[in-house]
Amino acid sequence: MADKVQTTLLFLAVGEFSVGILGNAFIGLVNCMDWVKKRKIASIDLILTSLAISRICLLCVILLDCFILVLYPDVYATGKEMRIIDFFWTLTNHLSIWFATCLSIYYXFRIANFFHPLFLWMKWRIDRVISWILLGCVVLSVFISLPATENLNADFRFCVKAKRKTNLTWSCRVNKTQHASTKLFLNLATLLPFCVCLMSFFLLILSLRRHIRRMQLSATGCRDPSTEAHVRALKAVISFLLLFIAYYLSFLVATSSYFMPETELAVIFGESIALIYPSSHSFILILGNNKLRHASLKVIWKVMSILKGRKFQQHKQIG
């Protein structure tokens, strides 16, 4: 029964992976083509491209981990070859979260309107420093990933190996103090970008409220370009926060799975849920970006035209 559930979850993971690769590759391809054409790249496009690349890598690592867990359980339990995968999963996980946080920060500074001197100073300089912020996210993610992978996953692999030999939950002996400190370190490292996104969300809400109030007082209506920009940014930030919560819970299931009777099943279940975040959020970003949305509509229109042309040719040959 457990094998059937694992196989079903694996097929689900493959489907989520395919959808995620399609959306994120589209974002990266459109922005890179625009970069080559204009010989420069806008800050928002740089953030979206970095986010798309990190999520493509994250999707590949998670799916590879799923395949090895189901098809090669002995390799999964050894802890030697898997250390590389563990490192890249932790790295791409934090890169994806921090790049999404950079996107939220960018929305807050570019769209929100406040007259505090510090906010205005940062608003005017955000385009100049965004590449350095992204580079800092890479350095920070590497700094977090190296010790976390070494400590946390060593205990996890040992536990999986012990359970496969004895089939008893209590046979797993890990250093709980070290494990708890590593989990606390990972949780705090993940909680920081979440809090930053939450602050960006509240800034956008407050800015939108003040803007609508000004528009109502001037009797010019509420549906102006600034309001639309606020709403699009809020949709992107809210979707990230909700999907991030689901992803974080699935991450907790996967990393805490050796306290459960069916470790392998808990891991692949957590990974299947985790794939939803990098897969679905890319399409929300496409719909919220004018250039990406128009490019996607062009692609859909061309595909429909090709399909209609093929149907016409088939009917012509039959007739």
Curated annotation (Swiss-Prot):
Secreted among keywords: no
Domain of life: Eukaryota
Stretches of the chain found on the membrane's Cytoplasmic side: 31-55, 116-128, 209-235, 288-319
A molecular-function term among this protein's GO annotations: bitter taste receptor activity
GO cellular component, one term: plasma membrane
Extracellular topological segments: 1-9, 77-94, 150-187, 257-266
Keyword terms: G-protein coupled receptor, Glycoprotein, Membrane, Receptor, Sensory transduction, Taste, Transducer, Transmembrane, Transmembrane helix
Entry membrane topology: Multi-pass membrane protein
Protein task: Gustducin-coupled receptor implicated in the perception of bitter compounds in the oral cavity and the gastrointestinal tract. Signals through PLCB2 and the calcium-regulated cation channel TRPM5.
Protein name, UniProt field: Taste receptor type 2 member 7
Organism: Pan troglodytes (Chimpanzee)
Organism ancestry: Eukaryota, Metazoa, Chordata, Craniata, Vertebrata
